[in-house]
Amino acid sequence: MARVCNFSAGPSMLPEKVLKQAQAELLEYGDSGQSVMEMSHRSKWFDAIITDTEATLRRVMNIPDNYKVGFFQGGATQQFAMVPLNFMTTGKADYIVTGNFSNLAAKEAAKFGEAKIVASSKDRNFTYIPDVNAIDYDKDASYIHICQNNTIFGTQYVELPQVEGVPLVADMSSMILSKPVDVTKYGCIYFGVQKNVAPAGMAIAIVRDDLLGHAADTVPTMMNYTTLLAKDSMYNTPPCWCIYMTGLVLKYLENDIGGLAKMQEINEAKAKVLYDYLDGQDFFKNPVEHRYRSTMNVTFTSPDPDLDKKFCAEAADAGFVNLKGHRLVGGMRASIYNAMPAEGVDKLVDFMEKFRKENA
């Protein structure tokens, strides 16, 4: 059976070359005589895997030496609690709410202190990003939190909030590794890996050194960043398979794609094809303000919810799967992460045009 074009928002596509390498090494990794899924996390083979994965991430993202990198269980949702537990030293933090996940992060933080929503785009159903330069930030806030790309609503930041002395914390789950990022602009970057990096089951956090070591003694051991980071992500058994797969994807980005600048060029070209089509006809609509349109997650609707259902069903039959929009938005959503080939987007546009002609 031919592989489908998978537009899932996550878990999502992985590069076929990476899958084939994992397949080839599934029963025996190197000369270990065992699968990565079986080996001890204290073995010399896995020690080499986790060390190389972190080193490759540092190269690919140009992460400075004064930042720690950690591989965490629990996904990005666990980070919603870890961030305030570790960083809310003044008892308050600023949150910009631009979608479901930033809202959930703010709600979680409110359990541990004052999580002030200083700006929100809820008034227009999260179809834009608030002007970060017009926000009244609290200079005594422990940090400013954003979700840099909004998976559900299809928006992304084009400018970052910058307040002197207040660290920026960003959830980058649905845009990480899609383009170069200046890590030095952030105090902490975290992301679930299941959208653009690896299979589900892990989050990665990149934390500036000066933010560590301030958690209260009452913070649970496994919710304290310092616990894991001081032990190079090996305080307890880490998500070994996810770390291995992350390493394969990073090597693919570095060696086959040519780095994040090249990946950005490819991604923007893919998104342009889809947005140009949406703007060139009147059947399908994208609700997002042009300036804030996501490169990774493209939302659209047809003239009628019943047609949306018909579109998704016929698309699946044609090999385009997981296009149904999130229940908060409806319609359709095409997640075109790094692993989605340009040909997949081209074929989707052809199918959309065919559907339009048959149903307009």
Regions found by a protein language model. Name each.
Residues 10, 109, 120-176:
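Active-site phosphate-binding strand-loop segment of PLP-dependent enzymes
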Residues 3-54:
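A glycine-/small-polar-enriched, mobile loop at the entrance of the PLP active site in fold-type I
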Residues 188, 193-275, 289, 358-360:
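Active-site C-terminal subdomain of aminotransferase-like
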Residues 77-142:
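PLP-dependent aminotransferase-like
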Residues 284-314:
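Conserved PLP-binding catalytic core of the aspartate aminotransferase-like
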Residues 33-79, 86, 100, 108:
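Conserved N-terminal alpha-helix of the aminotransferase class I/II PLP-enzyme fold
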Residues 2-4, 330-360:
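PLP-dependent enzyme catalytic core of the Aspartate aminotransferase-like
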